[in-house]
Amino acid sequence: MTKWFDTNYHYIVPEWHADTQFSAHPERIIAQIREAQAQGYAVKPTLVGPLTLLWLGKKKEDFGCRIKTLMPKLLPVYQQLLQAIADAGVEYVQIDEPILAADAGKPWLEAFPSTYQALAQAPVRIILGTYFASVAEHAALLNSLPISGVHIDCVRAPEQLATFVAQLDSSKILSAGVVDGRNVWRANLRQVVANLQAAKAKFGDKLWVAPSCSLLHSPQDLALEEKLDPEIKSWMAFAAQKLVELGNIKQALQNGLDSVQAALEASDAAVADRASNSKIHNAAVQTRIANLPKGADQRGAPFAERIKAQQAQLHLPLLPTAALRSAFESRPAAT
């Protein structure tokens, strides 16, 4: 297991061999699509992209470039999966390629055009999703791909919004991730709406508002929390509340700020209170920090000297500690 990029969520790392074979098993996702459709939702499924899937895997053997060896076998399976999703009545599919925000390397970037040319043959409209960091340097690449739109993380990298407003063709969809999918705090709705005005002017109805990333990183529903301090609770938004925030942002963009005045006022009050509340802002601590002498945040000796002194005193083995966090939790907390 390893962490999903820089989050605290983990995934089982697949191991790739030169003779690895892939096959499509769409039954589970099709069942989930049908369930959502039965409740009246227009479904936009999300898949991990083929380039990210191969990049994140563990190469078990030295068989050369994963792109050249495995991608020709993987792409037909993605095409089958997309066809099955299209047959279920889905118009849009989001395919996430977060490696664009990582240092994937030139061969992986060069593989995007051919990969998405192949995926574009499926009868669905593809939104290519990115998150956790800026992909502004790849705006031209993304604009050139045969896709219907791009999702960007405007929470972790708000500065990239201007780049995509300038460089993304207005015929494409810009999905702006403006509500933080990774924390528990309410968004500053008024500020978000203001930040989106230029994008709204260019893209019109092709501007989508979205969480910055999957909401699986947030708790489900704040309404289920009955023991939180009411004041602190008023600053929070879990996944269910973040969806409401997105609805308010959409309405404000379409119909003006007056159409969501009550929501804006509640957001303003929560943001202002959290910014100054004494429960989380300790004036005494702030004063102590401000009065720290110069160099108080620096070590007295470099690491090379400290490690020698530590070893001379403690005689530690190579791996002195190794523990999982769950080992320190009680069973009720762990379960």
Model regions: which residues?
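Domain-level signal for soluble alpha/beta catalytic cores
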Residues: M1-T335
